[in-house]
Amino acid sequence: MTTIRLKENEPFEVAMRRFKRTIEKTGLLTDLRAREFYEKPTAERKRKLAAAVKRHYKRIRSQQLPKKLY
C-alpha cells in the first residue's frame, strides 16, 4: 500500500500531487484498471500480442529513412 507522510505546513494540493506521483510510479492505477473486469486468458494473450506487433512496427517505422519531400 502506498503511503505518504504529510510534512509540517504542507498544503493539501502539494501532498495530493506527491501521492498521485507515487501511485503513478508504482503502476497501481494501471493494475487496478486491468483487474476491474475479468479478461479471458485468450483475450489477454491476443491484446498483448497486438501491442507487441504495434511496438514492433513503430520501432521499424522510427528507424526508416524519411521519404523525400519534393
UniProtKB/Swiss-Prot annotation:
Is-annotated flag, keyword Oxidoreductase? no
Superkingdom is: Bacteria
Which Gene3D superfamilies would you find in this protein's record?
Ribosomal protein S8
Give any GO molecular function from the UniProt entry: structural constituent of ribosome
Q: Which Pfam families does the UniProt record give?
A: Ribosomal_S21
Biological source species: Herminiimonas arsenicoxydans
Q: What is this protein called?
A: Small ribosomal subunit protein bS21
Please state which protein family the record places this protein in: Belongs to the bacterial ribosomal protein bS21 family.
